[in-house]
Amino acid sequence: MRISDSFFVDAKKILSPNFSEREKNIDLIVLHSISLPEGEYDNDNVEDLFMNKLNFDLHSSFQGLRNVKVSAHLYVKRDGTIIQFVPFNKCAWHAGESIFKGRKNCNEFSIGIEIQGKVDEEYTREQYENLKKILDALKIFFQIDDVVAHSEISPERKKDPGPLFDWSKLDEN
């Protein structure tokens, strides 16, 4: 995967309005999981959420998202499709209240990757294959060593990507 002008060249681009300027160097990648409604994948609800276009009346679980403005740099769908919402040189709003190695507000120094799924369900082969390519490219381009789960930087609030996320598949050749 090739990065040019803060974007993956081959990723689908849907530019979210939910970002801020980046003031710190990138040295962390945070992996998340998301599906709206939880466990339902055949829709564009996540894309709509990141674009502030989610129809909150579609599902009762969406009501708590009414005033939420969030985004991620990348979103990896079940079939492996990669969508980029925020350029890497900007802060996506993915981590919320967070801390890593004593530093707060991980959005400022991390890249956020949402993986379509839920914490108690296995991820797909296509997701692992493309996620490995993404991580390999980002680690080289930005010289990043640390890749963590959202649950690691926000342990009181978050559980994603969950216990069924197979980290060993990211190390396979």
Which residue ranges define each predicted feature?
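Basic/polar, cationic surfaces and motifs that engage anionic cell-wall
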Residues: 1-8, 23, 104-111, 118-173
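Short loop/turn segments at strand-loop or loop-helix junctions that form parts
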Residues: 34, 114-116
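Conserved beta-strand segments that form the floor/walls of ligand-binding pockets within enzyme
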Residues: 75, 112-114
